[in-house]
Regions:
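Conserved acyl-donor/pantetheine-binding loop and adjacent beta-alpha core of acyl/acetyltransferases
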Residues: 54-83, 87
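Conserved beta-hairpin
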Residues: 38-55
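A short helix-loop-beta-strand connector motif used in the catalytic cores of GNAT acetyltransferases and
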Residues: 27-43, 76
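Conserved GNAT-fold acetyl-CoA-binding loop/helix
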Residues: 5-31
């Protein structure tokens, strides 16, 4: 939870109510706890076992994705949080590559995400990592809804792959330039 709280504080500092909105925050936390309990959340560790981040997967969010999206063809990624200390190191890109590899191994064509509709910087980040905007949904009870997907065959960091062994923490491999 500390990573989540830290992320909420960082977002609040830049003027965003993402993840701390009083109307949607408690539902989001409950959903995240369910991902953890169901074994659909991974912790990202460095070689010293320091926590660098976390990521979850889950079923298609039916507030956004529907049958015409061919739900079964995608891996749905949620709650990618990178610690402040690890921000800007490329770990997010490694995790997205990992998710693409898992999706491909499962025979899925897409890695799909949704993010806050007003998080334009985050949307540009994902587009820079190979995601294409599919559409934006705006149900009245949600503030997320910017939907994007990336082909599961898209691997941007082939020399720094994370292990796809399920149930294990995601360990970041050391490199000469850890900031790469």
């Amino acid at each position: 939870m500390a990573l989540r709280t830290d992320a909420e504080n960082r977002l609040r500092q830049i003027g965003s109510d993402q993840w701390s909105d009083p109307e949607t925050g408690s539902r989001a936390i409950a959903k995240w706890h369910q991902h953890v309990e169901d074994g659909r959340t991974w912790v990202i560790l460095d070689e010293a076992d320091s926590i660098l981040g976390t990521v979850s997967r889950g079923p298609a969010d039916r507030d956004f994705w529907n049958e015409t999206d061919q739900l079964h063809t995608a891996f749905y990624l949620y709650k990618l949080i990178i610690s402040q200390d690890a921000a800007g190191t490329g770990i997010g890109s490694l995790v997205l590559d990992w998710a693409c590899r898992v999706a491909a191994l499962e025979g899925r064509r897409w890695l799909r995400i949704d993010c806050w509709r007003t998080a334009h910087g985050l949307q540009r980040y994902y587009e820079g990592l190979g995601f294409a905007h599919v559409r934006t949904e705006a149900p009245s009870h949600r503030k997320s809804g910017w939907l994007a997907q990336r082909p599961s065959g898209t691997i941007l960091n082939p020399d720094r792959c994370l292990s796809v062994d399920s149930g294990e923490p995601l360990s970041i491999p050391a490199t000469r330039d850890a900031r790469g």
